[in-house]
């Protein structure tokens, strides 16, 4: 239409702008009687105001007044679907919050009882599965509680954290367990895939004229699909510097625009980045006979790696400590519980004696490498001989396995199903 100048000149352009929240509230008051008659319910004034405010804040892909009208319509329809004995006569703020949380896929504003229980025990639950990293767990849980209590910044993500420390100490595991316990999605990106400049566009989508323009960005699509999630950017120091420029906007304003101009909302997302920067400086041996603390050297390496504007937008830089001998026995127990769960499916019960636990703790402990050598020791000395027995040997039909240490090696004692009964 606008290409034909002569035709355009004969028309006057009138822009129909999106109404303000107050104007939308007036529109809803005018429509209220129609919806009340249709759904056979009443809407309180506070419910209408909540529909306007919450839809404006959390439903980003539509405009006022349409999205506010959809919310009150859906709230009424939701009551009509209930049995007559459970129907409410008046729709209140809590009903509107529930509908908006379903549409926007975020947790409801008023915290439910089950949600409260999981938040109350979140710290304890995380410390039961990740050992020796209490500071990191305390920081993460306090950010989650602050956000759910409504005291966080409404325009920013739940939290932006940089986890730094040596390999194998639980940086990724803390994040994975947080998502698992909270019952929310874990969105994980390995930043070693985004080392080149052209790969950065995969996160937000290719620009017009480039291959893949019709496909959305991996990051923006994932957050649009799961607006309440934990976003894990693993080994972020390997990413191209342009990725950090993208993250500046996300950490400050909680939104990221994709190649189609659609905004992804990060305000209900916890952003966790992990890095090994500074780990080698922290694990440097001390000079002389006295033990020296090199944790400040690790922070110096992080300052060199990340720009001041990036560090300034982080809520916290959390230094993960190397695992000590006191913690490693609990790590042994964790691996044994996992093995027990795997064997239970095969009808095999497991008994690991204290001597075997001590042997595993001694041979699987490496302060520089964390918990990963333990997994390799268990695989080499327990799982490898066990695989033969499970497939072709004495445990093919189930049974009982006792593991003990003798003469600096592990011994396996097999008892078949018939012997146990």
What are these regions (language model features)?
Residues 1-421:
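AAA+ P-loop NTPase nucleotide-binding core of proteostasis motors
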